[in-house]
A protein has these predicted regions:
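A beta-strand signature from Gram-negative outer-membrane beta-barrel systems
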Residues: 1-16, 101-103, 116, 122-124
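Transmembrane beta-strand segments that form the barrel wall of outer-membrane beta-barrel proteins
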Residues: 19, 121-127, 378-387
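Outer-membrane beta-barrel initiation region
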Residues: 94-98, 108-112
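Membrane-embedded beta-strands of outer-membrane beta-barrel proteins
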Residues: 106, 142, 241-243, 299-301, ...
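A generic beta-sheet turn/junction motif
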Residues: 110-114, 123, 372
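Alpha-helical support elements that line or immediately flank enzyme active sites
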Residues: 241-248, 259-261
Length: 465
């Protein structure tokens, strides 16, 4: 894999600006019943359930029976008999919208005789299809290369970014599941808004029976309110930085050392007001904070040479080390005093968790590439890795590999085959491994137990032993 980095050229500074903009919309909405069709279906279902049991008609029952003779679930509200008294909406239209997305980029590059630079800034604003949600990102990038002498070069890369992501409601906030499920399962008979512009709730959509009772509307959570009022915001600040130095030790022999850091800070806040929470008055909020820091140090020596215009040799040996540190804190509170207060200090503590971990890894690496006449390739690699995630008796692993290749398209007999421009046959064998286990999986955890201490009946002590 060849990774290239944008870099300025010697000469005058070049400034480049790019702007892209577009619109997003739902490609295809799911067709839904209108109120008249939905009510007709509901009446048919309730009449059937009232009259039939397991496919058999119940004696003495008829579709014309009044509500007073029906079970609660089979009663027919007065409003169903005249659908014009009900609302007629498509919940997808109430939540989905056509939204813009923009991307701004500005960069400058240039250099002098011994220094080159590239600096850029980027701003992305992408509103979500559902109301109240969207994504913004601000990022910078700086690349600098400098020649200290004709044998020593240094370079610096830095890429900070800050993003704000307001995401949609997750599953479990309604009887129908998440937001997108609710949009295609909630009946069209309920309003999204009251006449004064506020979001409609259960209390704003009374239904009545002709026997003087009213059904309890338990299974309603306004999707428009859920999309607009449910808050789940993630703020992420990330910085990638690398500093490297290359030194030409001798002809065709180069030493390179680099140190890189990846710092990632995340703050996530959730707030669920009573208007969209099934639990009603149980308003709740959560806050999550985390810091993830990764360090990498690489040191390599490379020898590269060509002999007699046909033999190419590349030999690399090196040592690398990595370290990762992670720390997090999560807090949830219930019973916030009202829907305007969103901070966790104002509620009743429901749960809290904290975590702090770290890991290290060290590697010895080696590679030999040999090419003859640009036709025949031989590669051999060897690496030995040690990870702190494993126990002391199995911490290190050795992973060799080898490959041979024949670039057939470079042979003379392929000159007449115009249909093939590049053909290479390659065979390889190697061993690979990973350390994707828990950071402390190799260490036995301390557990709680009971113990009897003393003479006679003794004394029972609870706790860690």
């Amino acid at each position: 894999v060849l990774i290239t980095t944008k870099m300025g050229q010697r000469g005058k500074t070049v400034i480049t600006a790019n702007l892209s903009a577009g619109m997003q919309q739902v490609a295809h909405q799911i067709p839904m019943l209108n109120t008249a069709g939905w009510v007709e279906r509901q009446i048919a279902i309730r009449n059937y359930n009232h009259v039939y049991l397991n496919g058999e008609r119940r004696p003495g029952r008829d579709e014309s029976d009044p509500n007073s003779a029906r079970a609660l679930g089979n009663k027919i509200p007065n409003e169903y008999k005249d659908p014009s008294l009900l609302h007629d909406i498509n919940w997808q239209d109430e939540v989905y919208r056509n939204v813009p997305m923009t991307n701004y980029q500005l960069s400058a590059s240039g250099g002098t005789g011994s220094m080159r630079f590239y600096i850029s800034g980027n701003y992305i604003n992408q509103e979500a299809l559902n109301i109240g949600k969207g994504y913004k990102k601000y990022s910078l990038r700086g690349n600098i290369d400098a020649d200290i002498t004709n044998k020593i070069k240094v370079g610096f890369r830095i890429a900070p970014s800050y993003s704000i992501n307001n995401v949609g409601a997750s599953a479990g906030l309604t009887y129908y599941g998440g937001l997108n499920v609710a949009l295609v399962t909630l009946p069209p008979i309920y309003p999204a808004y009251n006449p004064d512009g506020t979001f409609a709730t259960r209390a704003d959509m009374p239904l009545t029976y002709d026997d003087g009772t009213s059904p309890s509307i338990l299974n309603f959570t306004n999707p428009a309110a859920m999309s607009a009022l449910y808050k789940s915001q993630m703020k992420r600040f990330n910085t990638l930085g690398t500093f490297f130095t290359t030194v030409e030790l001798a002809r065709n022999l180069v030493f390179k050392t680099s140190i890189s850091a990846d710092v990632n800070n995340v703050v996530t806040d959730h707030h669920v007001p009573s208007t969209i929470n099934i639990a009603g008055a149980n308003r709740y909020a959560t806050s999550f904070f985390s810091t993830n820091i990764g360090w990498t140090n690489e040191n390599t020596v490379t020898y590269e040479n060509t002999f007699n215009d046909k033999h190419r040799l590349n030999v690399l040996a090196g040592f690398t080390e990595q370290k990762g540190q992670f720390q997090s804190l999560s807090v949830r509170v219930n019973d916030l005093p009202n829907d305007l207060v969103e901070t966790v200090n104002a509620g009743t503590l429901a749960s809290r968790t904290a975590s702090k971990t770290e890991w290290t890894m060290a590697s010895l690496i080696g590679r030999v590439n040999y090419v003859f006449d640009d036709k025949y390739y031989v590669t051999a690699t060897l690496r030995r890795d040690g990870s702190s995630k494993f126990g002391s008796d199995s911490r290190w692993g050795t992973f060799p590999s080898a490959a041979i290749a024949w670039r057939v398209s470079q042979e003379g007999f392929m000159n007449s085959v115009q249909a093939i421009s590049e053909l290479k046959i390659r065979a390889s064998y190697g061993l690979v491994g990973n350390d994707q286990i828990g950071r402390y999986a190799a260490i036995g955890a301390v557990a709680a137990s009971n113990a009897i201490l003393g003479t006679g009946d003794g004394q029972q002590l609870n706790g860690l032993m």
